[in-house]
């Protein structure tokens, strides 16, 4: 080994290393002394102070090889270009958040143009690209500036239309709307959990598909977050999970500027972030100067060198750097104004026009990000071609997994006379789907035994066994759902997650993001009504059905028996652009007459006639889930009195709403106004189906603690009460 003395620090290099010549080149004007030296760290970062009026150099020792990285005036110009494009876009819109882009531009630039392997020419089509998630989505102007400079399909004109109707540059990033955006992160904190999910997917697919000499899944997930993200509970849930899972290819860049919208974070956020993340099992790296490109680069290298822990790089920045009011909340969420922009540009020594990109900056991105990305993707294509020749079946499975095609499965029908809870029939469906869809995996928020989500004969997804298909999300409902979004966004798998339906309130913000992003995630929500019983009103859903049904682009399905549950799972696994929420019972449900033949087609229309009136149609009983059996029994009781009613099973209101007017009329004829809806949940939303002349047998108060059957009786879910209620129409 050998060392090079710089006057202040010792740099250790490997003798005859290819990097030695580069090292000598940088120090060619200085007398160099070499001597044998041993016992240094395998993974170390070394800094060199100014040498011969040169900028500070950085050396990173990874596995005893030395990497050199330097930055020059063009790099600084590129950083300032990101800043000025962001400021100009926000000013043109007269709306936006300039503080983060101005403060975080250096770390974002270093990451993008010097580290990330992405190819703007193929965008999100290359499965092994690095992923970047902007959890602090209010800093979208910075992301759009980077996307433009990187060469994605985003023009200067698009930047000028920031936050305008129909533009490619909405106020917060939206996947599938803006080229190159990886996730719609939405409210703060969720992007961190999305990144955790992406890193989980990478680890899972790598364990499943990689072979010696063929690391076809081998990429990093980077996320940029601020102080606000770390205050949110979902980020803490997700960070805890990531630390346990030892996701070494997950890197958070923390824009630590000590300012939130209301003012200094000292008013509300004073914890030891380093201590917290180290307790989670993360590596913490501090960058003291957020404008020091070399120090940022060293931190990213050190993060990539740590393979057993996720890394958070805390970068101390100045919010709104360069602005007259930098370092204050005044620059967080409002345009700087013409005078404010002029002040900042003067501080940057910016001599170019508004929205101008200097030619040398364009060239620097072409030589950096673009050239590196194209080379990396071509190398991967060559590797995959060889992999395909060596492992054709695995290669075909990999390609199929990323095609996001509708999965078709066959599920064993349930016979009349049998009885089981829909959560149990769901578990049987999960088992059968796992045997037919190799990319299918998931778990529960510490309720797998109750939600019945575990796949038998499969291993657990744990460190050292990332191939496992049973995921233990822990008591982290929000992080589970947000991580599922990241898993779905990554591609290559189909994921599900379960909890009690009453706990759905904990995860709805992430379900909303799934629906907004057209992600085919599946939520297994069990213990769906007051039939939960003894646990009492805190654990008995009432308003949840009405709440989730109001969410656009979410299939909410409450099946009546095992055959409807099968149909629900078939529908869910066939979806490619919409999440599905299955609402399932704790208590046993008998298989109903007719569902074996009618359920699949009927469920795919949202509602269907399960039992027709025996005479001239006088009225309609509409029910869902466990109450369909009550409707059938009520029909029989009314028939005994000479009253002829139809029973409509309506497992999914939203799917029914999407049917043609003709079909809806065939199920609920306008001329038939005597209608009774029966459901053990809120009445909210049922008026559109029963009309002004109809009634509901529902619950608009809280539940109680008692055996489930007794509660149903006390709340009027009996044949006698349903019969009298119908007759009162």
From Swiss-Prot:
Its cofactor is Mg(2+); Ca(2+); Mn(2+); Co(2+). Pfam families: Transket_pyr, Transketolase_C_1, Transketolase_N. One of its GO terms (molecular function) is transketolase activity. Substrate binds at residues 97, 332, 423, 450, 527, 535, 586. The keyword Calcium applies. Its EC number is 2.2.1.1. Thiamine diphosphate binds at residues 138, 186-188, 228, 257, 332, 503. Gene3D superfamilies: 3.40.50.920, 3.40.50.970. One of its GO terms (biological process) is pentose-phosphate shunt. Binds 1 Mg(2+) ion per subunit. Can also utilize other divalent metal cations, such as Ca(2+), Mn(2+) and Co(2+). This is Transketolase.
């Amino acid at each position: 080994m050998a060392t090079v003395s710089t006057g202040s620090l010792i740099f250790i290099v490997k003798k005859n290393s290819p990097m030695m010549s580069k090292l000598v080149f940088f120090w060619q004007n200085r007398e160099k002394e070499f001597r044998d030296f041993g016992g240094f760290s395998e993974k170390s970062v070394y800094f060199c102070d100014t040498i011969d009026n040169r900028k500070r150099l950085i050396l990173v020792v990874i596995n005893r090889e030395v990497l050199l990285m330097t930055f020059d005036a063009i790099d600084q110009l590129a950083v300032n270009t990101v800043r000025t494009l962001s400021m100009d876009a926000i000013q043109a819109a007269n709306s936006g958040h300039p503080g983060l882009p101005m403060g975080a531009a250096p770390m974002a630039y270093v990451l993008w143009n010097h580290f990330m392997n992405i190819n703007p020419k193929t965008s999100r089509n290359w499965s092994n690209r690095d992923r970047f998630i902007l959890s602090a989505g209010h800093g979208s102007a910075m992301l759009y500036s980077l996307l433009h400079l990187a060469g994605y399909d985003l023009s200067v004109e698009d930047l000028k239309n920031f936050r305008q109707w129909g533009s490619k540059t909405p106020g917060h990033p939206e996947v599938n709307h803006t080229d190159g955006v990886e996730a719609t992160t939405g409210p703060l904190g969720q992007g961190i959990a999305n990144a955790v999910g992406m890193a989980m997917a990478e680890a899972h697919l790598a364990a499943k598909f990689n072979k010696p000499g063929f690391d076809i899944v081998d990429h990093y997930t980077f996320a940029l977050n601020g102080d606000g993200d770390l205050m949110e509970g979902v980020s803490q849930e997700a960070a805890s999970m990531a630390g346990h899972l030892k996701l070494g290819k997950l890197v958070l860049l923390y824009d630590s500027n000590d300012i939130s919208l209301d003012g200094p974070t000292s008013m509300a956020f004073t914890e030891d972030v380093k201590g917290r993340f180290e307790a989670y099992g993360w590596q913490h790296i501090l960058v003291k100067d957020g404008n020091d490109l070399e120090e940022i680069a060293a931190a990213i290298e050190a993060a990539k060198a740590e393979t057993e822990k996720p890394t958070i790089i805390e970068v101390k920045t100045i919010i709104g750097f360069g602005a007259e009011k930098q370092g204050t909340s005044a620059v967080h969420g409002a345009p700087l104004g013409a005078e404010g922009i002029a002040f900042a540009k003067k501080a940057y020594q910016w001599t170019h026009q508004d929205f101008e990109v200097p030619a040398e900056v364009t060239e620097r991105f072409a030589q950096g990000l673009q050239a590196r990305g194209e080379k990396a993707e071509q190398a991967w294509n060559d590797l995959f071609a060889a992999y395909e020749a060596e492992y054709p079946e695995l290669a075909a499975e990999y390609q199929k997994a990323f095609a996001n095609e509708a999965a078709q499965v066959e599920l064993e029908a349930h016979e009349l006379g049998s009885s089981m809870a829909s959560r149990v029939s769901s578990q049987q469906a999960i088992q059968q789907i796992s045997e037919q869809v190799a990319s299918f995996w998931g778990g529960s928020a510490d309720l797998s035994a109750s939600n019945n989500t575990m796949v038998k004969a499969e291993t657990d997804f744990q460190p050292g066994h990332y191939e496992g298909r049973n995921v233990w999300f822990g008591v982290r409902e929000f992080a589970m759902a947000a991580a599922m979004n990241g898993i779905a966004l990554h591609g290559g798998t189909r994921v599900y997650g379960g909890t009690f339906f009453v706990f759905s309130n904990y995860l709805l913000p992430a379900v909303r993001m799934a629906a907004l992003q057209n992600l085919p995630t599946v939520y297994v929500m069990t213990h769906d009504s007051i039939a939960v019983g003894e646990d009492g009103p805190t654990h008995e859903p009432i308003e949840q059905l009405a709440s989730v049904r109001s969410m656009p682009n979410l299939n909410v399905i409450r099946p009546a028996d095992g055959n409807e549950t099968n149909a629900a799972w078939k529908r869910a696994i066939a979806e490619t652009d919409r999440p599905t929420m299955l609402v399932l019972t704790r208590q046993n449900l008998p298989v109903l007459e007719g569902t074996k033949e009618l359920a699949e087609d009927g469920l795919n229309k949202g509602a269907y006639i399960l039992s027709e009136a025996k005479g001239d149609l006088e009225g309609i009983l509409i029910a869902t889930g466990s109450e369909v059996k009550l409707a059938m029994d009520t029909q029989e009781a009314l028939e005994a009195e000479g009253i002829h009613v139809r029973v409509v099973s309506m497992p999914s209101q939203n799917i029914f709403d999407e049917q043609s007017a003709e079909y809806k009329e065939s199920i609920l004829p306008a001329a038939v106004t005597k209608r009774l809806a029966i459901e053990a949940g809120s009445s909210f939303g049922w008026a559109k189906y029963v009309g002004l002349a109809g009634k509901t047998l529902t619950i608009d108060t809280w539940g109680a603690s008692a055996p489930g059957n007794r509660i149903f009786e006390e709340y009027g879910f009996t044949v006698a009460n349903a019969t009298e209620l119908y007759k009162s129409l």
